[in-house]
Design a protein with these regions (language model features):
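Catalytic cores of transferase enzymes with a strong primary signal for eukaryotic protein kinases
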Residues: 69, 99, 106-154, 178-179
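Single conserved hydrophobic/aromatic residue that forms the stacking wall/gate
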Residues: 1-8, 12
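Active/binding-pocket-proximal capping segment
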Residues: 96-98, 104, 108, 162-171, ...
């Protein structure tokens, strides 16, 4: 386990996996809502660095130490769906009964201990709320875990198209916090959540849909660190106009400073139109490589004056199953990336 803050610069790089199986991502937790919210915020866009027996450690659990009941549900539920190590940080001889019941919730613990070991990632961010999802039980299966998370201080309305979750047909739902089945949904999931609350769901669809959109914030960035010791370090940055409210900035400039998506899925393979949405800027180039094949070099990505986002479309060939897409620019800066979408060429 890596806990020294000086070591956390390494924690999201491949070499850390040779040292430990988990790493702290933040300063120490406190039994306060602001601390819980801060740590979740730190981990929202680090899913690419978890899995395969290695995890982002969100620190010990402060259940039973003064948080409100709904805040404790957020705390434990989000630690579970994000596959954080679970370490009890309270006195079990004095813990309130309701808090102890939450800690003993077998369905949430099973979610945390799911054999796939994946961390949920953000697929939607609207109205101050976040929607996170991950595969459980079987990769690319029909069962997924979903969190509707409202960190704000007011009521939040959620409207989540099932296509965003890659789920088709009638979808069965179970509330893992309350441990009860909910009415099945089809088309769109609509919910209203109070402040500082979460809804953790096990969802089972009739059909698993092929993904269409891949956000930049899902990508693995080998040069990323969050210590803030160097200027112009590649990072996940907020952008209101971006499809998921985030972009990847400071991409390129050297060969190793790339963004990589290693689970770009195609059911049957074939030719696709890939449309990259980016922030236009003068003197930027973008190199795209799929499955280590010959790269595609895009130039003249300046766009027009005042343009917030621009897009460019290329044709790529995908193999059946998972594909690796890498974007960067070895000799100059690349544009900031919002997302890319895929459309099968018939």
């Amino acid at each position: 386990h890596l806990c020294d803050r000086r070591q956390r610069q390494m924690c999201i790089r491949d070499r850390a996996k040779n040292i430990g199986c988990s790493w702290r991502i933040s300063s120490d937790i406190r039994p306060e809502w602001g601390s819980v919210k801060y740590i979740i915020d730190k981990n929202l866009y680090l899913s690419a660095y978890a899995g395969d027996g290695h995890y982002n450690d969100m620190d010990m659990l402060e259940i039973g130490r003064g948080l409100k009941p709904e805040e404790e549900e957020v705390h434990f539920g989000m630690w579970c769906i994000m596959s954080s190590p679970l370490l009890i940080g309270c006195d079990l001889t004095t813990i309130p009964e309701a808090s102890l019941k939450l800690l003993k919730n077998k369905e949430l613990i099973a979610l945390n201990q799911d054999p796939l070991g994946l961390q949920a990632y953000v697929v939607q961010h609207e109205n101050k709320g976040y929607v996170l999802v991950k595969d459980i039980e079987q990769e690319r299966g029909k069962v997924r875990a979903v969190a509707l998370y409202n960190p704000s201080d007011s009521i939040c309305d959620f409207s989540v198209p099932m296509s965003v979750l890659e789920m088709g047909g009638k979808v069965k739902m179970r509330d893992l916090v309350k441990q009860k089945d909910l009415k099945a949904v089809q088309g769109t999931l609509n919910r209203q959540l109070p402040a500082h609350s979460v809804l953790i769901l096990r969802m089972e669809a009739e059909q698993r849909l092929e993904p269409v959109r891949y956000e930049a914030e899902w990508a693995y960035l080998p040069c990323f660190n969050d210590l803030g010791l160097r200027p112009k370090t590649i990072l996940y940055a907020p952008m209101k106009e971006a499809s998921g409210g985030m972009k990847v900035s400071y991409l390129g400039g050297r060969a190793e400073n790339y963004a990589e998506w290693n689970k770009v899925y195609s059911e049957k393979g074939g030719m696709y139109e890939m449309t990259i949405q980016y922030v236009p800027h003068a003197d930027r180039k973008l190199e795209i490589r799929v499955n280590n094949e010959k790269s595609i070099l895009l130039k003249d990505l300046a766009g027009t004056d005042g343009q917030q986002l621009a897009s460019v479309t290329v044709q790529v060939r995908l193999k059946p199953g998972n594909n690796v897409v890498r974007m960067g620019s070895p000799y100059c800066w690349a544009p900031d990336i919002d997302c890319f979408t895929l459309k099968k060429i018939e």
